[in-house]
Amino acid sequence: YPTLKEQKANEHLNYINNIFMTYKGGGFSMVSFPEYEYDLKLTPEEENADIAIYVLARNSGEGMDRRLIKGDALLTDTEIKDILYLNNKFKKFMLVLNVGGVVDLTPVKLVSNILLLSQLGVVTGDILANIILGKQNPSGKLTTTWASIPDYKFLKEFGSLDDTNYVEGVYVGYRYFDSVGVKPLYPFGYGLSYTSFDISKVSLTNEKDEIKIKVKVKNEGDFYGKEVVQVYVSPSQENVDKPYQSLVAFAKTPKIEKAKEVEMTLNFKLRNVARYDEKKANYILDKGNYIIRVGNSSDCTKVFGYIELTEDVITEDLKNINSNPDFEDFKPEVIYKDNLKNVQKIKLTKNDFTIKKVEYSYECKTQKEIENLDNKELAKLCIGNYIDRKTEGSLGMGTGFAGQTTKYVEEIKNTLIMADGPAGLRVSKVYGIDYRGYHKLSPSTLLMNDYSFYEIQGKITLEKDYSEKESSFSDYRKIVHQYATALPIATAIAQSFNVEFGKLCGDIVGKEMKVFNIHLWLAPGMNIHRHILCGRNFEYFSEDPLVSGKMAAALTLGVQKYKNKGVTLKHFTGNNQEFNRLNSNSKMSERALREIYLKGFQIAIEEAH
């Protein structure tokens, strides 16, 4: 009896702990894909087929992180068995990855034809069909390193209930792998197509610290296509440890026909490679050589030249804003050396730079309407149009959005309507209108034979025929259906490495914001792909701050083409796990904060303000 009593007590304690952990995590349930045990038996017709396609799917979402288990970040035994069987059976076999994040493909790395389809919204099926049929040529590149699970050194520094220690410092993603010499399965910036390209140097020039690189990109294959030119800089190794290389510029070519070539010019400022000195609270370029590498992935570059900096240069004076964590950042032991003989050199001194001094001002200007509000009215203003019933939506044409500023303060005549959505606007698909206002409804409760189509202001709307004798939903004078476009996830947009495509996606959102009377889109997400298990990595662009900032700016510019339509760059900042996100404490050095986690926000704001 004592043993049984102790067992039951432990079970009850575990039950309570699970409830506590779920509550603290504050998330939604994320399930791994189940493993089905079966034998893959092909019919005679299938045996004689020319090609086989296997689609691997994964999901994730807000509130909970992914897990290091089979069916999530790992392949199941059945998936491995089936993929390898089909790969050996069919000469033409394609593994399609319909995923929003990294999956460890080590067990199937022998498969030579893998398509990262990602999650592309309404066009997903069309794109897959066009690629299979050869009507379109994929040209994307990875914005996150895909590696074997054992090669991720800092796996344990993730998912803690309270404190999360960013001990990797600035060595995030490819900055870590390249610096320690670990070869991932698929490096940052990597991506194949139905053709191949050669990138050669035309010229390397400068105007003070702005470096200009002209390249020639030639299509050497038998199919038209596009290439992504990527420029990396390996910084001086003087004084302080630094990543082996960092992306400083990228550009997508236009479509290049076979045997044709194009010239492109990319530029960057050397000041953007400066490291942050925590002791002196400034950005500094250490004297030494800065090597310029150009290629089509972080793992495939050529040295095009180098910059010789004759002295230390302070590029920006700031002040520290972060408290020191109780740990030391990771430092690699590798020292990098390149043979720079017969390589073009550009010589710079501190006279080629201007020191940026930041003036801090805490003056806050408010509208006159705000100045006259009392504390109660200010409180209402802060919490927005809060109603303690989830069935109620925001007022206006588009009910059921993420929120609305308050209508309960008489002095505030105008309100802002906001819509969530990581891949386009999230709106209620159906809502009802009666004498009380607007109400969110569930489509499953509506009987379609009670509705008719009406044309209002040139738009077709599905409305409920009103009758006082009707029961159930008879109170609603009108039922309105509305749908927004499902766009590619942020990671997929970034993998295009095409800022014009980013602007186009933003344009779609901005246009629909105008239709639905939405003022602010609660996107794009700016957080870094610090860890492959973050449940919302699909909402974010990349492990690299330059890609994140550039693509966020592109989306923002697309939205802001429309008057009074805007975005909210989120989540500011260091929100890199979902578990216990409302209570967790992200601890990092000032250097990591500024060089990695704030950099994307800075780029987006500066380029899209």
Question: What is each model feature region?
Answer:
Residues 306-316:
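Short beta-strand edge segments in extracellular beta-sheet folds
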